[in-house]
Amino acid sequence: MMLAGCLTDRVIVDNHAASGRSTKSFINEKRWERVLDRIQPGDYVFIQFGHNDEKEDPKLHTEPGTTFDDNLRKFVAETRSKGGIPVLFNSMVRRKFYCNENGLYTDSLIDTHGDYLLSPKRIAEEKGVVFIDMNKITHDLVKQMGPEKSKELFMWVGKRKDDTHLNIKGARIVASLAIEEVGKKIPALGKEIRRYDYVVATDGSGDFFTLEEALEMIPLKGKCTVLVRSGQYGPKPPFVNKKIKITEEKGVSWGSSAAHAEKPLKNLDLYLCVGQSNMAGRGK
């Protein structure tokens, strides 16, 4: 979950995303109840569903315009009842390009979500909630990259050809684009955005788990910035390269015997609630 690496360490990202969930199953499995119990006044709650609400499985399926909309209304109303601030997102695009009569892929993407894209926007307008058009953001990104290069964003590994779920690179890029759009609409969070070319994090919220891995993989040409997030790492690798600027969060400790450093106090929380593993969360 890459969102934490896009924000300062004043923001706690509490990720409640669960793969394969719809608004219906998220509620029925008591996942929403657990989020609601944790919300404090001033928390931001990011809500994005749709991919799994589309499925025919009766445990998952909802209808746009009726049950899907009603569940989104529930999330908004109950978040506000706890003093939280809901933010609605629609579904990111699937990497599905049109084929022409010659069997060749064009640069046009097929809409696989239909009216499920409209419900979050409709409820946001109805309830006066911030809406982030993740479908447009990711549509523009994938279309610009084209049929071949866009595979670099998704889980194309070996024989696996997954055009729905992002890999680490894709998740980092999409999270960065998403939080930039959030920052435009929510100035309080916009002030907390940080921009680095690469992030190292022990909890999987970055591009690499270790600084050593990052230094091995980063291209040598050009300048770049690297953020090392709070956590305990092995011995700090020797490093001399004036073109690479490394920033360490408070709470970074080096050396296999180093004790965990105490994490700094946070005063912003962000909670994410999502029905697939690409995006998810809750917040303060």
Predicted regions and their residues:
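Serine-esterase "nucleophile elbow" of acetyl-processing enzymes
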Residues: 1-17, 33-41, 254-284
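N-terminal, post-signal-peptide region of Sec/Tat-exported proteins
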Residues: 1-25, 218-232, 236-240
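Active-site-proximal beta-strand/loop segments in catalytic clefts of secreted hydrolases
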Residues: 15-21, 47-52, 89-93, 133-137, ...
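Short, flexible loop segments at the rims of nucleotide/cofactor-binding pockets, characterized by
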Residues: 21-25, 107-109, 202-205
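N-terminal post-signal-peptidase region of extra-cytosolic proteins
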Residues: 23-34, 209
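Alpha-helical cap/lid subdomain in secreted, periplasmic
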Residues: 30-168, 172, 176-190
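Short aromatic-glycine-(Arg/Gly/Cys) micro-motifs in beta-strand/loop hairpins
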Residues: 195-201
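N-terminal extracellular ligand-recognition/capping segment immediately after the signal peptide
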Residues: 203-213, 222-253
